[in-house]
Amino acid sequence: MDQSFTKNQPKWQERQPLPEPDNIRVMTSPSLPPEDPLEEIVAPFSAAAPRRLGAMCVFCGANAGSDPAFREAATSLGGALAAHGATLVTGGGSTGLMGAVNDGALAGGGKVIGVIPDFLKSKELADLRSTELLVVPDMHTRKRTMFERADAFCILPGGVGTLDETFEIVTWRQLHLHNKPIILFNVKDYWTPLLAMFDRMRDMNFAHHGHEALVTVVHSAAEAILAAERELAEPKPVVRFPGMKGT
């Protein structure tokens, strides 16, 4: 090894961790308690939906996408939630559409709860402006915490992570483990191919007729909130698929 190189390197000193701001809470408990993991997962999903929209979880991309309409829709949704008096629940990042929906909510004086895994704090640049920022140990805890904090869900354009979050809550609803509204915000027809894929699943007998009742498609922020409120006030009938208990 080149001694002249190592000789000139700075001596790193151990840094003491800085105290977290008051709005940041680090959650260290594991997502799956070893004594009874299945019960711990299912229990939160079994609760009955509330009758008013107190908080909406928004799934969206940590990137802004190629069309300015995506960011505009995200900002509009955040502002509409603030005006409605509903709390915004997000993945806790400050970039892309996640940051834009936070911008809209905070500019309107709304409350924002961010939930971010510790290992993503630097990659997604945790939004320290959040009213409450929950730092959780892993992705499973993130999704579960977001679910527990929300009365309804709205999905904006996003990538693989957004699809992961979306399919999980749709699957749980199909299995009758929750009946919270799931709103698909179809900005610039972004989700139209996904909706076509749902239909293809049905046509190829991989999904049952009635699967379309699991989600509600909207095209504006105002429509998203109205759809969530309407469904919370008058929940959709639980879709009974063949082969499931109660059919």
Task: Map each language-model feature to its residues.
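Polybasic, lysine-enriched low-complexity intrinsically disordered terminal tails
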Residues: 5, 18, 27-29
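A cross-family phosphate/adenosyl-ligand binding-site feature
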Residues: 22-149, 187-247
